[in-house]
């Protein structure tokens, strides 16, 4: 990794891209400390440490939500809009057809996604206002103050969408991923400080710290191993004349084990948090009190039923998203059109059935590991002394995936530069 960065720094074009990325990330990190006016951030501390979806959003926003800064929503509206658009492409034939029209179709879908992200940011901004008002974090509550809060959050989120595009075009990696990556990295020193504070206060001992760090390293190693792991389906192509002899082409279809884990966890987290969010709007209702406080409620993070349901939903969404991402029927059809076949499997419907069976197995393995990643913060909060420490397997997964993707992109561009130098 370090050698790749060192070699990339020697190439002027890549060095310029790296510097552009650092510059744009610095702008957005400075903006994450610009507060929205009229907010008492001290009252939000318990909210962001309560676990669940809000804690996760605070983590991927680099603590911007707990500070309720201009970038409190981060790129969350854009992520949600992207996921919704991917699902709508399955349900709406016109959108599905648009996605198959090459660059022009993708640009149109991207434009729709951005408009949808702005709409979602308005809804999330107003929802954030309701939440902070419930926790008594508003210094003023006039209509103009509400308008300024919503407007500030929407403008901040829209600016980050634009900034992410600039990083993608002028910098290194995917802009949205880089923003989330930088936010999680920025939260690591605070995590270390929280552990140190617990140790000094006598709430934990050095043995617990060593075990915690060891578990984090083991989780990191497991995520790296499974992220790089893939199930390869061998594909052969019909004989073609190459000079005076016949040659048979070979290739493979790589299926990532945990490629859809992040989205699956976000889906499951959203479903699990939705009843609790609705219940918070009706604190005096008996059904709301049962959802938030009953030991038999599957939406109460302190119960074993919550953990079980969370795992089931994560495995299901991993399978679901794997199916809609790879589409066995289209894979089989494209393979047949290119005169390709899987050894020992007949073309057409048998190939589709075979691909679906392999995808189901891969999705099950990936879903189980995704479920383990998802419940790590819940287990830490319920059964350890590290309740106040923001630590999640999902953040580790994001860090690993973005780091490896950046290295792959730099390696590819370095290879292209070497070839260009050779040709010139």
Cite the ranges covered by each PLM segment.
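N-terminal cationic and glycine-rich segments that engage phosphates or anionic surfaces
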Residues: 1-99, 104-424
């Amino acid at each position: 990794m370090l050698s790749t960065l060192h070699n990339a720094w020697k190439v002027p074009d890549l060095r310029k891209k790296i510097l552009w990325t650092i510059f744009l990330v610095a702008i957005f990190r400075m903006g994450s400390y610009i507060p929205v006016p009229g907010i008492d951030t001290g009252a939000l501390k318990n909210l962001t440490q309560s676990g669940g979806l809000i804690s996760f959003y605070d983590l991927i926003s680099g603590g911007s939500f707990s500070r309720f800064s201009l970038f409190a929503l981060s790129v969350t509206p854009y992520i949600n809009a992207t996921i919704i658009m991917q699902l709508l492409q399955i349900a709406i034939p016109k959108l599905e057809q648009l996605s198959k029209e090459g660059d022009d179709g993708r640009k149109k879908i991207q434009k729709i996604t951005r408009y949808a992200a702005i709409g979602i940011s308005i809804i999330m901004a107003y929802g954030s206002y309701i939440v902070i008002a419930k926790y008594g974090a508003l210094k003023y509550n006039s209509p103009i103050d509400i308008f300024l809060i919503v407007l500030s959050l929407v403008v901040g989120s829209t600016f980050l969408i634009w900034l992410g595009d600039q990083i993608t075009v002028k910098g290194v990696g995917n802009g949205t991923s880089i923003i989330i990556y930088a936010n999680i990295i920025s939260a690591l020193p605070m995590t270390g400080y929280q552990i140190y504070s617990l140790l000094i206060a006598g709430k934990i001992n050095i043995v617990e710290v060593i075990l915690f760090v060891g578990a984090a390293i083991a989780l990191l190693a497991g995520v790296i191993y499974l992220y790089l792991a893939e199930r390869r389906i061998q594909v052969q192509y019909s004989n073609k004349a190459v000079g005076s002899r016949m040659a048979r082409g070979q290739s493979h279809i790589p299926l990532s084990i945990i490629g859809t884990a992040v989205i699956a966890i976000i889906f499951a987290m959203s479903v699990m948090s939705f009843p609790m969010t609705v219940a918070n709007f009706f604190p005096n209702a008996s059904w709301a009190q049962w959802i938030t406080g009953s030991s038999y409620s599957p939406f109460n993070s302190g119960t074993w039923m919550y953990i079980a349901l969370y795992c089931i939903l994560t495995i299901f969404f991993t399978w679901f998203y794997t199916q809609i991402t790879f589409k066995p029927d289209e894979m089989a059809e494209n393979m047949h059109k290119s005169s390709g076949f899987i050894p020992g499997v007949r073309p057409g419907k048998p190939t589709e059935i075979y691909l679906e069976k392999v995808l189901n197995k891969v999705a099950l393995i990936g879903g189980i590991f995704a479920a383990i990643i998802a419940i790590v913060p819940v287990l830490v909060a319920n059964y350890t002394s590290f309740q106040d420490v923001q630590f999640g397997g999902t953040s580790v997964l994001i860090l690993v995936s973005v780091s490896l993707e950046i290295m792959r992109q730099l390696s590819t561009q370095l290879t292209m530069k070497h070839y260009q130098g050779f040709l010139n």
